[in-house]
Amino acid sequence: MSEHDLVIRSGTIADGSGGELLDADIAISGGRITAIGKVAGKGREEIDASGKIVTPGFVDVHTHYDGQSIWAEELSPSSSHGVTTAIMGNCGVGFAPCRKGDHDMLINVMEGVEDIPGVVMSDGLPWNWETFPEYLDVVASGKRDIDVAAYLPHSPLRVYAMGARGAAREPATADDLATMRKLCREAMEAGALGFATSRLSIHKTADGGSIPTFEADIAELEAICGGMADAGTGTFQVVLDAFVGWDKEYQVIERVVESSGRPATFTLASGNDGPPRWRRVLEMIDRTNASGGKATAQIMPRPIGLIAGLELTVHPFILCPSWAKIAKLPIDQQVAAMRDPGMREALLSEEFEPGHPFNALARDWNWLFPLDNPPDYAPPKEMSMAGQAAAKGCTPQEIAYDRLLETDGKGLFLAALGNYENGTLASAHEMLSHPHCIPGLGDGGAHYGAICDASYSTYLLKQYVQKANGYRFDLAEAVHMLSHKAACAVGLNGRGLLQVGAKADINVIDMDRLELHLPEIVRDLPAGGQRLHQRATGYDATIVSGEIIRRFDQSTGARPGQLIRGA
């Protein structure tokens, strides 16, 4: 009879603490780690990890699986990249609390902010909840491969408490604030991980309006976070408005942390050019933590960007007036139309019409690059559309247009919007090296047609550990950032560590085989919707609560994932 449920043999362990690597076995029983060292007893199942690294499961603190966690059992791409815990409800958008009459409004917000087609949400969600605790119960009742936790999102909370006034962004009254504070406390007591909001000006609804939380008074955020203080738990997650300035917006963090006593986490990035204001923000974070508060910045390890292409939500010609004539054609007919000299002349000369802010970002020729297989997320500046045009003596539009024709419309572009200061990863590396910064902003479950960044864990290991082209982290440090450090930032202090008694969330990774593949379009959403997915190779095994959910980069069908209720 086997003494253990599972034994991982002879791996090199990076235990998530950032400490020394250890060559040892790991024994697992009952979903927990029972031994680390030389394990004598046999396992019911065994994994030979010789020559491989063994890590804790990774913790992705910024996802939007609020819908996908209900309509799907696999939280991919995240679970394809070693993530075993995903935090959803970020940016203050989600589906609860919500009265029946407000379903369409929340769909409109989610479609605009997170690029999830409306029909996917209307067809894919049962909407069999009203309150946030009821929503958590629905999530808890489902089956999935990895664990999830959820923030209480500000937009639906505001509309639920204020009705049409909340959607119209009217100031909250004292009664409104008291109601939202009470609902926040109730959400924390039911198992919410915290409260989330967005102040970002380019977060728009599908019809182009501002989301309910845009420009909400800081006093409103203090009141709601008072509900977390009342409950004695919860993390405040916020997307600050980068267009106002991270340093100017940081007062939101300072005031909420001071008034509520709750920790905060937020997204931080560098611009590609201009003054490095992010360094000033790092100083502010240090000040917050030195004074007894806690603030953590989430950093994307590669350029924050969009993926553009004819079959996706954005591409360099989508808002040209003539594009409307062929927008609804199949891609082969679009390409045939683009080969016509008249259409070519029109699309190369026309200016963009007004539209969602994301569309214009695919026309920043200085930071628009080809994305091929294997994908290069840190390309040289001369590979940009502007750089290639300068070398060839033509316009950037022509370079982009010809790429689309040469690839029969299948060619992809990377629009690097930030974290690529002066065309290098230096700023991302420096921010990630900071004691109060963690990797984040994977956005899994959202931006289905424009972003596929949930693969950042694989990228960090590949780019900063294996390649280390000028910007390096050692393996133990990188694993620490992806696991325990990330978990602690949102109050999940017991996760992301390989130690006896810990939950058995584990990766076995073949670093020699580790590769990140070009994003691809899959059509597996409700109502036949499509999304971007990105695969990796090199994950020999991913384990959740002692069950192997993925083996050699393929799902095993195991569904041990659960809802995490509270920190």
Residues of each region from the PLM?
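Histidine-rich, glycine-flanked metal-binding segment
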Residues: 2-7, 13-57, 519
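Acidic, glycine-enriched loop/beta-strand segments at the rims
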Residues: 14-25, 412-422, 428, 474-479, ...
